[in-house]
Amino acid sequence: MMDEELDFLLGTMQWSFSRLNSYYNCAYEWFLHYVECNKSENGFFGEYGSLIHKILEKYEKGELSLFELNEYYEDHFDEDVPHDAPPNKFVNIRQSYYDKGIDYLDNIDLDLEKYEILGVEKKVEFKINDKDFVGYI
């Protein structure tokens, strides 16, 4: 890819936290994914986050009670999070996340009657130094 093409691509790209974080973690992987447009499969962290989001959404919609969250988590963890976490010589990240998920859902204090939900994953678009950004809140 020529420098001019890369400058054009970067100048017209819509940026997000995940794009910036991807670059921060591995510039080459970011290049392959966002510049070369190589498909990458979802990894452990994305799958884990999607499972937690799905559980909380089911609770908000009334499909799961507060007392059913952990059971759903345990029943769906291996199916919804099939990829292994990256290796770490100090801790088994997969097991650590699994345990923290159980602890989180066991101790969650989420009384929806106390809150007015204004939106879920509401898209927000803005500019920083003439660069387009998108985020979800």
Where are the language model's segments positioned?
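Nuclease catalytic cores
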Residues: 17-64, 98, 121-122
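Nucleic-acid nuclease catalytic cores
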Residues: 125-137
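Accessory/regulatory regions of helicases
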Residues: 1-6
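A non-catalytic, helix-rich entry segment at domain boundaries
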Residues: 51-128
